C-alpha cells in the first residue's frame, strides 16, 4: 500500500483527449514556461462545473494542460473568425488551438472567456489550452495562477 501511495503521488493518468492518453510522471516545478505540460488545481467553481457536467470522474480534482501563453507572449493571443466554419478560432502565434464554442458536445450552454481576459496580466498568470476541439480549458475557465500549478508532467506510457 505504501508503494502504491508513492507511485500515485508521482504519476497521473490522462483519460481525456485534451492531451495524449497515457501515464504522466509528475515533477516538481522549478520554473514554468510556454510548452510545459502542467498539473494544476482549478478553483472550486471550475471543479464543481466539470464534475456536474461529467467532463471528468468525480474523484478527479486536478487537470493537466499545456502552457501556451504567459505574460511575455500575451500579445500573440488572438481570435480569428473562420468564415467557412462560421466559428471563432483561438490562436497563439501561428498555432490554431481550435474553435471557441458556446455549447458543449451535449448541446449545453458554455460560456467562453473574452479575449481580454485570456491575456495574462502579470508573470504569475498562464493560458492553458489543448488543441483538441472538445477540450475544456482556459478558453472557458480562464487564466491559471502560478499558485494553482502543482507539478510539471511528462508522458511516460502512451495508451
For each predicted feature, which ranges?
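Soluble "head" domains of membrane/secretory-pathway proteins
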Residues: 8-159
Amino acid at each position: 500500500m505504501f508503494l502504491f501511495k508513492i507511485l500515485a503521488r508521482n504519476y497521473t493518468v490522462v483519460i481525456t483527449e485534451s492531451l495524449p492518453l497515457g501515464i504522466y510522471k509528475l515533477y516538481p516545478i522549478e520554473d514554468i514556461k510556454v510548452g510545459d505540460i502542467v498539473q494544476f488545481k482549478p478553483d472550486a467553481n471550475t471543479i464543481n462545473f466539470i464534475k456536474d457536467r461529467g467532463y471528468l470522474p468525480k474523484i478527479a480534482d486536478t487537470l493537466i494542460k499545456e502552457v501556451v501563453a504567459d505574460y511575455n507572449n500575451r500579445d500573440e493571443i488572438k481570435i480569428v473568425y473562420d468564415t467557412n466554419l462560421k466559428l471563432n478560432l483561438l490562436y497563439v502565434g501561428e498555432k490554431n488551438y481550435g474553435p471557441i464554442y458556446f455549447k458543449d458536445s451535449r448541446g449545453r450552454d458554455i460560456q467562453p472567456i473574452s479575449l481580454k481576459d485570456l491575456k495574462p496580466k502579470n508573470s504569475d498568470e498562464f493560458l492553458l489550452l489543448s488543441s483538441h476541439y472538445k477540450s475544456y480549458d482556459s478558453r472557458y475557465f480562464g487564466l491559471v495562477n502560478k499558485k494553482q500549478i502543482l507539478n510539471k508532467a511528462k508522458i511516460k506510457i502512451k495508451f
